[in-house]
């Protein structure tokens, strides 16, 4: 199993901030925004959480979730939460026209957030499949096995649940 520790991951900080609606110029009428490297922003992108999921913010407020780090700027996740929030707030002012201070903020840092499917990554997938094949009751699922997106992880979990159910039926 120690081989799986060699999978390279990008670190990411998730920064959730709430604002009074009148302090955000952008209509927030979509999913969010990805911030391409050419824009020279600190954050990778921002999701308009309260637009996507009603009830995520009190009436008259909005909730925004930004992501910092990745392979583009892994050093940013080593900063203090105050420094990370300062960088994100600068970006939100630029991209969304935020004028006020956050009414709420929460930062989570994930040192091993996104597995990198580098050249040769297939050896990890092969190892997982072989290990599952020779280890009764061992099943792998998730972003390190079947894709990094949330959708990929859901499908991976569903498929693993099916394999587990089949295994349990066959062994009982």
Regions inferred by a protein language model and the residue ranges of each:
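Mid-domain catalytic core of redox enzymes
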Residues: 1-64, 69-82, 87-90, 94-95
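A short coil-to-beta-strand element that immediately follows conserved catalytic motifs
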Residues: 12, 28-29, 97-110
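Hydrophobic residues at beta-strand termini and immediately following loops
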Residues: 46, 105, 141
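FAD-binding beta-loop-beta segment adjacent to the flavin cofactor pocket
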Residues: 52-59, 110-140
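Short FAD-binding loop at a beta-strand-to-alpha-helix junction that anchors the flavin cofactor
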Residues: 63-65, 129-148, 152, 156
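Surface-exposed helix-capping loop/turn segments at secondary-structure junctions
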Residues: 94-104, 166-172
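Internal hydrophobic alpha-helix adjacent to the cofactor/substrate pocket in enzyme cavities
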Residues: 153-172
């Amino acid at each position: 199993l120690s081989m799986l520790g060699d999978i390279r991951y990008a670190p990411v900080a998730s920064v959730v901030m709430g604002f009074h609606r009148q302090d955000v110029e952008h209509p927030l009428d979509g999913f969010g925004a990805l911030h391409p490297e050419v824009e020279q922003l600190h954050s990778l992108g921002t999701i308009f959480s309260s637009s996507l999921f009603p009830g995520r913010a009190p009436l008259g407020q909005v909730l925004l979730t930004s992501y910092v780090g990745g392979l583009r700027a892994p050093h940013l996740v080593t900063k203090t939460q105050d420094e990370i929030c300062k960088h994100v707030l600068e970006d939100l002012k630029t991209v969304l026209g935020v004028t006020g201070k956050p009414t709420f903020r929460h930062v989570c840092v994930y040192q091993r957030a996104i597995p990198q499917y580098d050249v040769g990554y297939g050896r990890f997938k092969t190892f997982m499949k072989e290990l599952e094949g020779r280890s009764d009751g061992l099943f792998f699922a998730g972003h390190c096995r079947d894709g990094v997106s949330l959708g990929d992880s859901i499908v991976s979990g569903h498929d693993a649940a099916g394999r587990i159910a089949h295994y349990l039926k066959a062994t009982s």
